[in-house]
């Protein structure tokens, strides 16, 4: 969105993406799911569209925005191919299958307006005194302004910034697991019967405050979805939940988080 807005205002942004274009990335992800062969720079976390492309496409936010930016995001997604129902649904959802098309369409618009996107390119250093960034350890690019949209799991980039003396602070986090159960079980509890007809796959959100002050709650519930391997490092495991637009999978899943 940053690149898109800059291009809309007449700038020619250069977007540096460590991963692959979304179509190539889709093939890398599918190969990983089938064979276990991981590309550390093109996977569920890294590549065009970021981690969100393969993370269900839910568009929920608890941030109140009087300036209308949340609405702008939804309208922009529709402009580039997302279903119009995200404009009025209480819990708008695009789905990974449609997000791939939306991401590609946004990229094409950015380049049409004069922007550039360099794939398989990673910022490996910043040199503030020279107003430069270093790409892939060798190419130096001068710029008066750089936006670091680090995203999810780029701990090597965070380490580089720390080594460069960038101020940063720790952030609290929650720990949990992802659970999976038949979608028919959730439908039966929500609708009173397993056959839901034309009703959508049912969802849920649960929370509990314990006597010891700890909390437990469900998060990122995926009706009719899938639990997927979301690893981005060799010999490391990360799991995530996702669903396609139709939410037609046999199972539902959700993260269960403790604080």
Q: Where do the language-model regions lie?
A:
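Residues forming the flavin
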Residues: 1-259
């Amino acid at each position: 969105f940053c690149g898109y807005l800059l291009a809309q205002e007449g700038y020619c942004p250069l977007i540096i993406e460590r991963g692959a274009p979304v179509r190539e990335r889709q093939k890398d992800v599918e190969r990983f799911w089938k064979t276990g062969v991981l590309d550390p720079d093109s996977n569920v976390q890294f590549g065009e569209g970021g981690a969100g492309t393969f993370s269900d496409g839910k568009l929920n936010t608890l941030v109140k925005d009087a300036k209308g930016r949340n609405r702008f995001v939804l309208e922009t997604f529709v402009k580039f191919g997302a279903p119009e129902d995200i404009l009025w649904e209480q819990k708008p959802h695009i789905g990974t299958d449609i997000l791939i098309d939306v991401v590609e369409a946004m990229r094409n618009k950015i380049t049409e307006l004069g922007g550039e996107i360099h794939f398989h390119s990673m910022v490996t250093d910043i040199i503030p005194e020279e107003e430069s960034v270093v790409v892939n350890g060798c190419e130096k690019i001068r710029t008066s302004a750089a936006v670091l949209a680090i995203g999810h799991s780029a701990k090597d980039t965070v380490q580089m910034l720390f080594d460069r003396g960038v101020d940063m602070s720790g952030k609290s986090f929650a720990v949990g697991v992802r659970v999976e159960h038949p979608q028919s079980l959730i439908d039966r509890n929500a609708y009173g019967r397993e056959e839901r007809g034309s009703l959508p796959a049912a969802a849920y959100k649960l929370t509990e405050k314990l006597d010891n002050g700890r909390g437990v709650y469900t998060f990122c519930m995926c009706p009719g979805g899938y639990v997927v391997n979301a690893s981005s490092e060799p010999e490391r495991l990360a799991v995530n939940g996702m669903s396609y637009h139709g939410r037609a999978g046999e199972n539902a899943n959700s993260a269960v988080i403790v604080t």
